[in-house]
Amino acid sequence: MTTLTKKQINWLDKCASGIWTLNPKTGLVDVKGTFDCSDRGLKGFKGVKFGVVTGDFWCNYNLITSLEGAPQEVGGSFYCDGNSLTSLEGAPQKVGGDFNCAYNSLTSLEGAPQKVGVDFKCSYNQLTSLVGSPREVGRNFRCDENRLISLVGAPQEVGRGFDCEYNRLTSLEGATLNVRLELFRSCGNPVSGKTLVAIFEKMCGGHSFVIAAASLRNEMSKTSWKFIAPHIPDAIQPGVSMLGRFGLFN
C-alpha cells in the first residue's frame, strides 16, 4: 500500500496523538506519539498496516479478531484487551511498556512478543498452555483465569511478580523461578495455593518439581496430593516423602 484512502486518512487523524507518516517504500504507517482507536466497534485496522509507534497503541474494547496490521514495534504499551482474538499472530514483536491481551478468546500465546519491558497480561482467556510466552518480562506476568494445568512455556525471566491464580494447575513444571516469592500468586487451583507456594519455594531453592512436591507429601491435604500424585513416579514417592520428614529438602 503506497497510498491511503480518505477514510483511512481521517481515521488516522482522529486516533493519532502526534505525527503519523506513510512510508511509501514499505506501505507502513509510523506514528511519533500515541495511537488510540479503542472502543470504536472496530473489527480490524481499516486496511492500515502500522510500522513503528513510539508511544502507546490502544486498540482495546473493540471487536477485533486478528492483529494483522498491528504495529511491528511499540515504544510504549500495547493494549488489545477486550476483543475477540483467538491468536496473537501479527502482534508487535517489540514492546517497551505493557502488553495486555486479557479478556479475549486466546487458546495460544504463539505470536506474542519475546520481550516485554513492563507487564504482560493474558488473563481471562482460554489458554491451556503458556508456550509462546515472552522469554523476558520486565515486571509482572499474569496468566490468571485460564485453563492451565502446568506452567510449561512460562517466561525464563520475570522481574517482579507471577500470577497464575484460578487455573487448573496440578503441576508447577516450567515455572519461572526468579520472581519474588511473596508475589507468586496461585490460589484457586485444584492444588491449594498454600501447597503450590511451598512447592514453588523449594523449586526456587534448586529442587525439581517432582522432588519438591514429593518431599511435601506429608504436609499437604489429601485433595492436593490426589492431583499431584500422578506427576510423581511411584518408585520415588516413599523414599522422598520419608527424607522430607527429616528436613533434607528444607
Provide a role label for each language-model segment.
Residues 1-49, 196-250:
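N-terminal capping/linker segments that flank leucine-rich repeat
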Residues 31, 45-48, 59, 67-70, ...:
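Canonical leucine-rich repeat
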Residues 164, 177-213:
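Leucine-rich repeat domain C-terminal region
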Residues 14-80, 95-97, 101, 117-118, ...:
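LRR N-terminal entry segment and analogous cap-like coil->beta motifs
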Residues 68, 79-80, 86-89, 101, ...:
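Serine/proline-rich low-complexity intrinsically disordered segments, especially terminal tails, linkers
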